[in-house]
Protein backbone atom coordinates (compact mmCIF):
# COMPACT_ATOMS: atom_id res chain seq x y z
CA UNK A 1 0.00 0.00 0.00
CA UNK A 2 1.20 3.49 -0.88
CA UNK A 3 -0.01 6.71 0.74
CA UNK A 4 0.67 9.88 -1.25
CA UNK A 5 0.25 13.58 -0.49
CA UNK A 6 -1.90 15.23 -3.14
CA UNK A 7 -0.85 18.24 -5.20
CA UNK A 8 -3.10 21.18 -4.30
CA UNK A 9 -2.44 24.44 -6.10
CA UNK A 10 -2.20 27.42 -3.77
CA UNK A 11 -2.14 25.23 -0.67
CA UNK A 12 0.39 22.39 -0.67
CA UNK A 13 3.45 24.40 -1.63
CA UNK A 14 7.03 23.47 -0.80
CA UNK A 15 6.62 24.86 2.73
CA UNK A 16 3.62 22.73 3.59
CA UNK A 17 5.11 19.71 1.80
CA UNK A 18 8.17 20.07 4.00
CA UNK A 19 6.18 20.32 7.21
CA UNK A 20 3.65 17.58 6.47
CA UNK A 21 6.25 15.06 5.32
CA UNK A 22 8.17 15.56 8.56
CA UNK A 23 5.25 13.92 10.38
CA UNK A 24 5.63 10.60 8.56
CA UNK A 25 3.23 8.18 6.93
CA UNK A 26 3.65 9.64 3.42
CA UNK A 27 5.43 7.65 0.72
CA UNK A 28 5.69 10.46 -1.83
CA UNK A 29 4.34 13.89 -2.67
CA UNK A 30 3.66 15.98 -5.77
CA UNK A 31 4.32 19.61 -6.61
CA UNK A 32 1.64 22.15 -7.36
CA UNK A 33 1.04 22.09 -11.10
CA UNK A 34 3.54 23.84 -13.34
CA UNK A 35 1.55 25.52 -16.10
CA UNK A 36 2.80 24.78 -19.62
CA UNK A 37 1.45 26.89 -22.46
CA UNK A 38 3.26 27.24 -25.77
CA UNK A 39 6.95 27.41 -24.96
CA UNK A 40 9.77 25.75 -23.12
CA UNK A 41 9.81 27.15 -19.61
CA UNK A 42 12.99 28.47 -18.02
CA UNK A 43 14.57 26.37 -15.29
CA UNK A 44 13.56 29.08 -12.81
CA UNK A 45 9.88 28.17 -13.30
CA UNK A 46 10.60 24.68 -12.04
CA UNK A 47 12.80 25.94 -9.23
CA UNK A 48 10.03 28.25 -8.01
CA UNK A 49 7.43 25.52 -7.53
CA UNK A 50 9.75 22.56 -7.04
CA UNK A 51 12.78 23.78 -5.06
CA UNK A 52 13.21 20.22 -3.80
CA UNK A 53 14.84 19.50 -7.17
CA UNK A 54 17.93 21.16 -5.68
CA UNK A 55 18.03 18.52 -2.95
CA UNK A 56 17.60 15.33 -4.92
CA UNK A 57 13.85 15.78 -5.48
CA UNK A 58 13.15 15.01 -1.83
CA UNK A 59 11.72 17.01 1.02
CA UNK A 60 13.90 17.71 4.05
CA UNK A 61 12.43 14.57 5.63
CA UNK A 62 13.61 12.51 2.66
CA UNK A 63 10.19 11.96 1.09
CA UNK A 64 10.37 11.72 -2.74
CA UNK A 65 8.73 14.53 -4.70
CA UNK A 66 7.25 14.28 -8.18
CA UNK A 67 6.82 17.13 -10.66
CA UNK A 68 3.33 17.82 -12.00
CA UNK A 69 2.70 19.53 -15.34
CA UNK A 70 -0.56 20.99 -16.63
CA UNK A 71 -1.39 21.97 -20.18
CA UNK A 72 -3.02 20.85 -23.42
CA UNK A 73 -0.23 20.90 -26.04
CA UNK A 74 1.28 17.40 -26.27
CA UNK A 75 4.53 18.53 -27.88
CA UNK A 76 5.10 21.45 -25.52
CA UNK A 77 4.29 19.31 -22.49
CA UNK A 78 6.72 16.68 -23.74
CA UNK A 79 9.53 19.24 -24.15
CA UNK A 80 8.96 20.61 -20.66
CA UNK A 81 8.74 17.12 -19.18
CA UNK A 82 12.13 16.34 -20.69
CA UNK A 83 13.55 19.50 -19.14
CA UNK A 84 12.04 18.61 -15.75
CA UNK A 85 13.82 15.26 -15.94
CA UNK A 86 17.11 16.99 -16.77
CA UNK A 87 16.59 19.11 -13.66
CA UNK A 88 16.14 15.99 -11.53
CA UNK A 89 12.45 15.08 -11.59
CA UNK A 90 12.17 11.34 -10.78
CA UNK A 91 8.55 11.11 -11.99
CA UNK A 92 6.42 13.28 -14.29
CA UNK A 93 2.78 13.60 -13.24
CA UNK A 94 0.15 15.07 -15.58
CA UNK A 95 -2.80 17.07 -14.29
CA UNK A 96 -6.19 16.24 -15.78
CA UNK A 97 -8.18 17.03 -12.66
CA UNK A 98 -7.84 20.70 -11.73
CA UNK A 99 -11.39 22.13 -11.43
CA UNK A 100 -10.46 25.84 -11.37
CA UNK A 101 -12.46 27.87 -13.89
CA UNK A 102 -9.50 29.99 -14.90
CA UNK A 103 -7.46 26.88 -15.63
CA UNK A 104 -10.26 25.14 -17.50
CA UNK A 105 -10.95 28.22 -19.65
CA UNK A 106 -7.40 28.03 -20.95
CA UNK A 107 -7.73 24.31 -21.75
CA UNK A 108 -6.02 22.93 -18.71
CA UNK A 109 -6.98 20.42 -16.04
CA UNK A 110 -10.37 18.72 -15.90
CA UNK A 111 -11.75 20.31 -19.07
CA UNK A 112 -9.50 17.95 -21.06
CA UNK A 113 -11.60 15.03 -19.83
CA UNK A 114 -13.96 16.02 -22.63
CA UNK A 115 -11.26 14.93 -25.11
CA UNK A 116 -9.99 11.41 -24.36
CA UNK A 117 -8.05 11.33 -27.64
CA UNK A 118 -6.08 14.38 -26.50
CA UNK A 119 -5.42 12.75 -23.12
CA UNK A 120 -3.91 9.78 -24.92
CA UNK A 121 -1.81 12.00 -27.17
CA UNK A 122 -0.45 14.02 -24.26
CA UNK A 123 0.61 10.99 -22.25
CA UNK A 124 2.04 9.28 -25.33
CA UNK A 125 4.20 12.28 -26.29
CA UNK A 126 5.42 12.84 -22.74
CA UNK A 127 6.21 9.15 -22.37
CA UNK A 128 8.26 9.25 -25.58
CA UNK A 129 10.14 12.38 -24.52
CA UNK A 130 11.38 11.34 -21.09
CA UNK A 131 13.94 8.65 -20.24
CA UNK A 132 12.58 5.12 -20.07
CA UNK A 133 13.40 4.86 -16.36
CA UNK A 134 11.27 7.92 -15.51
CA UNK A 135 7.62 6.98 -14.88
CA UNK A 136 4.83 9.14 -16.31
CA UNK A 137 1.65 9.20 -14.22
CA UNK A 138 -1.73 10.92 -14.45
CA UNK A 139 -4.27 12.42 -12.07
CA UNK A 140 -7.85 12.65 -13.27
CA UNK A 141 -11.39 13.28 -12.10
CA UNK A 142 -14.39 11.23 -13.14
CA UNK A 143 -15.26 13.71 -15.86
CA UNK A 144 -16.22 17.32 -16.45
CA UNK A 145 -19.94 17.29 -15.66
CA UNK A 146 -20.67 13.55 -15.74
CA UNK A 147 -18.78 10.32 -15.00
CA UNK A 148 -20.08 8.74 -18.19
CA UNK A 149 -16.72 9.11 -19.92
CA UNK A 150 -14.54 8.16 -16.96
CA UNK A 151 -13.69 4.69 -18.21
CA UNK A 152 -12.81 5.93 -21.69
CA UNK A 153 -10.56 8.63 -20.22
CA UNK A 154 -8.86 6.21 -17.84
CA UNK A 155 -8.26 3.77 -20.68
CA UNK A 156 -6.82 6.54 -22.86
CA UNK A 157 -4.39 7.56 -20.12
CA UNK A 158 -3.31 4.02 -19.32
CA UNK A 159 -2.86 3.03 -22.96
CA UNK A 160 -0.98 6.26 -23.62
CA UNK A 161 1.67 5.18 -21.13
CA UNK A 162 0.63 6.23 -17.63
CA UNK A 163 2.37 4.04 -15.07
CA UNK A 164 -0.49 4.59 -12.67
CA UNK A 165 -3.64 6.67 -12.32
CA UNK A 166 -4.88 8.73 -9.40
CA UNK A 167 -8.66 9.06 -9.58
CA UNK A 168 -10.30 11.91 -7.70
CA UNK A 169 -13.73 10.36 -7.40
CA UNK A 170 -15.78 13.41 -8.35
CA UNK A 171 -16.45 15.38 -11.51
CA UNK A 172 -15.16 18.87 -12.16
CA UNK A 173 -18.65 20.32 -11.64
CA UNK A 174 -18.94 18.59 -8.26
CA UNK A 175 -15.70 20.23 -7.14
CA UNK A 176 -15.12 19.21 -3.54
CA UNK A 177 -18.77 18.63 -2.67
CA UNK A 178 -19.41 15.32 -0.85
CA UNK A 179 -19.73 12.50 -1.51
CA UNK A 180 -16.82 11.04 -3.43
CA UNK A 181 -17.99 8.27 -5.74
CA UNK A 182 -15.51 5.59 -4.73
CA UNK A 183 -17.45 2.95 -6.66
CA UNK A 184 -16.17 4.57 -9.85
CA UNK A 185 -12.60 3.93 -8.74
CA UNK A 186 -13.49 0.23 -8.69
CA UNK A 187 -14.89 0.51 -12.20
CA UNK A 188 -11.73 2.21 -13.42
CA UNK A 189 -9.64 -0.60 -11.93
CA UNK A 190 -11.70 -3.09 -13.89
CA UNK A 191 -10.76 -1.55 -17.25
CA UNK A 192 -7.09 -0.60 -16.87
CA UNK A 193 -4.01 -2.71 -16.22
CA UNK A 194 -2.10 -0.15 -14.18
CA UNK A 195 -2.34 0.62 -10.44
CA UNK A 196 -5.13 3.01 -9.45
CA UNK A 197 -5.00 5.32 -6.43
CA UNK A 198 -8.25 6.41 -4.76
CA UNK A 199 -8.55 10.10 -3.89
CA UNK A 200 -11.31 12.21 -2.37
CA UNK A 201 -13.16 12.51 0.97
CA UNK A 202 -10.70 10.49 3.05
CA UNK A 203 -10.69 12.47 6.28
CA UNK A 204 -10.40 9.70 8.87
CA UNK A 205 -9.32 6.08 9.29
CA UNK A 206 -12.97 5.04 9.03
CA UNK A 207 -13.24 6.92 5.72
CA UNK A 208 -10.19 5.03 4.47
CA UNK A 209 -11.72 1.70 5.47
CA UNK A 210 -14.96 2.54 3.64
CA UNK A 211 -13.03 3.78 0.61
CA UNK A 212 -11.01 0.58 0.44
CA UNK A 213 -14.13 -1.56 0.77
CA UNK A 214 -16.05 0.32 -1.94
CA UNK A 215 -13.22 1.09 -4.36
CA UNK A 216 -11.06 -1.96 -3.85
CA UNK A 217 -8.05 0.34 -4.12
CA UNK A 218 -5.08 -0.46 -1.92
CA UNK A 219 -3.27 2.79 -2.72
CA UNK A 220 -4.58 6.21 -1.74
CA UNK A 221 -3.80 9.87 -2.18
CA UNK A 222 -4.65 12.23 0.67
CA UNK A 223 -5.32 15.93 0.16
CA UNK A 224 -7.41 18.10 2.45
CA UNK A 225 -7.73 15.22 4.91
CA UNK A 226 -3.99 15.20 5.53
CA UNK A 227 -3.73 18.99 5.60
CA UNK A 228 -6.38 19.13 8.33
CA UNK A 229 -5.01 16.09 10.20
CA UNK A 230 -1.25 15.93 9.55
CA UNK A 231 -0.79 12.45 10.99
CA UNK A 232 -3.64 10.88 9.01
CA UNK A 233 -1.13 8.89 6.98
CA UNK A 234 0.38 7.48 10.17
CA UNK A 235 -3.08 6.68 11.53
CA UNK A 236 -4.04 4.80 8.37
CA UNK A 237 -0.72 2.94 8.24
CA UNK A 238 -1.17 1.84 11.85
CA UNK A 239 -4.71 0.66 11.17
CA UNK A 240 -3.53 -1.22 8.10
CA UNK A 241 -0.80 -2.96 10.12
CA UNK A 242 -2.99 -3.60 13.17
CA UNK A 243 -0.82 -1.43 15.40
CA UNK A 244 -1.91 0.82 18.24
CA UNK A 245 -1.37 4.49 17.53
CA UNK A 246 -1.88 7.61 19.63
CA UNK A 247 -3.08 10.41 17.34
CA UNK A 248 -1.10 13.62 17.23
CA UNK A 249 -2.20 16.07 19.91
CA UNK A 250 -2.33 19.84 19.61
CA UNK A 251 0.78 19.96 21.76
CA UNK A 252 2.53 17.70 19.22
CA UNK A 253 1.33 19.87 16.35
CA UNK A 254 2.51 23.23 17.72
CA UNK A 255 6.18 22.78 16.70
CA UNK A 256 5.01 22.10 13.14
CA UNK A 257 2.90 25.25 13.14
CA UNK A 258 5.87 27.27 14.30
CA UNK A 259 8.15 25.70 11.69
CA UNK A 260 5.60 26.46 8.99
CA UNK A 261 5.43 30.07 10.15
CA UNK A 262 9.21 30.33 10.28
CA UNK A 263 9.51 29.17 6.70
CA UNK A 264 6.60 31.31 5.53
CA UNK A 265 8.31 34.41 6.89
CA UNK A 266 11.64 33.42 5.36
CA UNK A 267 10.28 32.61 1.89
CA UNK A 268 7.27 34.92 1.49
CA UNK A 269 6.81 38.65 1.78
CA UNK A 270 5.18 40.07 4.96
CA UNK A 271 2.16 40.79 2.79
CA UNK A 272 1.51 37.13 1.99
CA UNK A 273 2.94 35.14 4.90
CA UNK A 274 0.02 35.83 7.30
CA UNK A 275 -2.50 34.61 4.74
CA UNK A 276 -0.68 31.32 4.29
CA UNK A 277 -0.59 30.77 8.05
CA UNK A 278 -4.30 31.49 8.37
CA UNK A 279 -5.11 29.28 5.40
CA UNK A 280 -3.57 26.20 7.00
CA UNK A 281 -4.87 27.06 10.45
CA UNK A 282 -8.42 27.34 9.09
CA UNK A 283 -8.16 23.80 7.75
CA UNK A 284 -6.82 22.52 11.06
CA UNK A 285 -10.00 23.73 12.77
CA UNK A 286 -11.73 20.66 11.36
CA UNK A 287 -9.63 18.38 13.56
CA UNK A 288 -8.41 20.47 16.49
CA UNK A 289 -10.63 22.57 18.81
CA UNK A 290 -7.50 24.46 19.82
CA UNK A 291 -7.08 25.60 16.22
CA UNK A 292 -10.50 27.24 16.42
CA UNK A 293 -9.28 29.35 19.34
CA UNK A 294 -6.04 30.31 17.63
CA UNK A 295 -7.73 31.03 14.31
CA UNK A 296 -10.14 33.41 16.04
CA UNK A 297 -7.11 35.28 17.40
CA UNK A 298 -5.29 35.39 14.07
CA UNK A 299 -8.18 35.85 11.67
CA UNK A 300 -7.86 39.61 11.33
CA UNK A 301 -4.19 39.83 12.23
CA UNK A 302 -1.70 40.81 9.54
CA UNK A 303 1.23 41.91 11.67
CA UNK A 304 3.94 39.26 11.50
CA UNK A 305 5.40 40.13 14.90
CA UNK A 306 2.06 39.75 16.65
CA UNK A 307 1.38 36.48 14.83
CA UNK A 308 4.75 35.22 16.01
CA UNK A 309 3.84 36.05 19.59
CA UNK A 310 0.50 34.28 19.28
CA UNK A 311 2.20 31.19 17.89
CA UNK A 312 4.76 31.32 20.67
CA UNK A 313 3.83 31.88 24.30
CA UNK A 314 0.08 32.25 23.82
CA UNK A 315 -0.19 29.17 21.59
CA UNK A 316 1.18 27.04 24.41
CA UNK A 317 -1.82 27.72 26.66
CA UNK A 318 -4.53 27.10 24.09
CA UNK A 319 -5.21 23.62 25.38
CA UNK A 320 -6.26 25.15 28.69
CA UNK A 321 -8.56 27.55 26.85
CA UNK A 322 -10.64 24.75 25.35
CA UNK A 323 -10.43 22.28 28.23
From Swiss-Prot:
It is an enzyme of class 1 (oxidoreductase). Its EC number is 1.3.1.-. Belongs to the Dus family. DusC subfamily. The record marks 35, 95, 176, 276, 278, 299 as: Interacts with tRNA. InterPro entries: Aldolase_TIM, DUS-like_FMN-bd, DUS_fam, DusC, DusC_C, tRNA_hU_synthase_CS. The active site is at residue 98. Catalyzes the synthesis of 5,6-dihydrouridine (D), a modified base found in the D-loop of most tRNAs, via the reduction of the C5-C6 double bond in target uridines. Specifically modifies U16 in tRNAs. FMN binds at residues 7-9, 68, 139, 199-201, 223-224. One of its GO terms (molecular function) is tRNA binding. Keywords: Flavoprotein, FMN, NADP, Oxidoreductase, RNA-binding, tRNA processing, tRNA-binding. Pfam families: Dus. It comes from the Bacteria. It catalyses: 5,6-dihydrouridine(16) in tRNA + NADP(+) = uridine(16) in tRNA + NADPH + H(+); 5,6-dihydrouridine(16) in tRNA + NAD(+) = uridine(16) in tRNA + NADH + H(+). This is tRNA-dihydrouridine(16) synthase. Its cofactor is FMN.
